[in-house]
C-alpha cells in the first residue's frame, strides 16, 4: 500500500461510513513469498493467490461470509488478454468457496467515479489515484526488497505532496514513482554513491486504454527531485518517464 493509505481507508470505512471493517497487515507473508521472484507475471500471480488465502482465512473466522467483492474494471479484462495478467481476472483459484461479485467490471475508471459520486462516497475515496491490484509490488521492479519498497513508498509520498501543492493532483489522471532493481553511480558529500534511481510516471487518459504524458512544469519536477534526493535514503538519481500508451503501459510491470 502507499504511505498512509491503509489509515485513510480505515478512517473512511470505520469512522465515516460506520462499516465493520477488518484490517489485516499481511506484509511479511507477501514479502516472504516474493523473495527473489523477479518475473512480473509470477509476481502478480503470487500476490493474487496469497490475497485470496488471507481473505479466506479471515472469512472463516466469521459466519455467513459467502461473497468476495472485487473492484475489477473493464481495462483489467481487456489487458489480461495478452498484455499483462491481472490477479482479479482469471487468477482466482477454481476451488474458491465464495461467490464472486464484480459490480463495475464492465465500466471504465471515469465511469466508476460517476457511480461513486451518485452513491455519495467521500470525494477523497472517489478521486483517489488508480492503484494496481498487486499494489507497490509491480512498482518495485524485479525482485522486491524492503529497502527499495521503503524508497518507493517515501518517494511516491513526496511526489503526491508536491503535485497537490502545485494544483496538479486534480489535473493529472495518474502519477506515481517506480524504483527499478539496478543501482546507479552518484556523488554525495564528495564521495561515490551507488544507490537506486527513482522514476516518475505521470499520465493523462480517459479510459486507461491509451494515455498521454502531461507537460509538468519544470519547477515542480525540480522540487520533487530535490526532495526525493534529500529525504529518501538510498536514492541518487530521479528520472521522468515520457512514454505514452501505447507503446508503454501505464504501469511498468
Task: Give the positions of each predicted feature.
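ATP/NTP-dependent adenylation/nucleotidyl-transfer catalytic domains that generate, transfer
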Residues: 1-253
Amino acid at each position: 500500500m502507499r504511505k498512509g493509505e491503509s489509515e485513510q481507508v480505515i478512517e473512511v470505512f470505520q469512522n465515516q461510513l460506520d462499516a465493520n471493517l477488518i484490517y489485516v497487515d499481511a506484509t511479511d507473508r507477501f514479502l516472504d513469498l516474493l523473495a527473489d521472484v523477479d518475473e512480473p507475471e509470477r509476481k502478480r500471480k503470487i500476490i493474487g493467490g496469497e490475497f485470496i488465502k488471507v481473505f479466506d482465512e479471515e472469512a472463516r473466522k466469521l459466519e455467513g461470509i459467502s461473497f468476495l467483492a472485487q473492484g475489477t474494471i473493464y481495462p483489467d479484462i481487456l489487458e489480461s488478454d495478452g498484455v499483462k495478467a491481472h490477479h482479479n481476472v482469471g487468477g482466482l483459484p477454481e476451488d474458491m468457496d465464495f461467490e464472486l461479485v464484480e459490480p463495475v467490471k464492465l465500466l471504465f475508471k471515469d465511469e466508476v467515479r460517476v457511480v461513486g459520486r451518485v452513491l455519495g462516497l467521500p470525494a477523497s475515496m472517489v478521486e483517489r489515484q488508480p492503484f494496481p491490484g498487486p499494489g507497490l509490488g509491480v512498482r518495485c521492479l524485479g525482485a522486491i526488497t524492503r529497502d527499495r519498497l521503503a524508497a518507493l513508498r517515501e518517494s511516491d509520498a513526496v511526489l503526491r505532496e508536491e503535485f497537490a501543492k502545485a494544483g496538479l493532483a486534480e489535473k493529472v489522471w495518474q502519477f506515481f514513482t517506480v524504483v527499478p532493481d539496478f543501482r546507479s553511480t552518484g556523488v554525495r558529500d564528495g564521495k561515490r554513491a551507488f544507490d537506486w534511481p527513482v522514476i516518475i510516471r505521470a499520465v493523462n487518459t480517459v479510459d486507461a486504454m491509451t494515455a498521454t504524458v502531461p507537460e509538468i512544469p519544470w519547477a515542480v519536477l525540480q522540487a520533487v527531485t530535490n526532495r526525493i534526493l534529500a529525504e529518501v535514503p538510498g536514492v541518487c538519481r530521479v528520472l521522468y518517464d515520457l512514454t505514452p500508451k501505447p507503446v508503454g503501459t501505464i504501469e511498468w510491470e
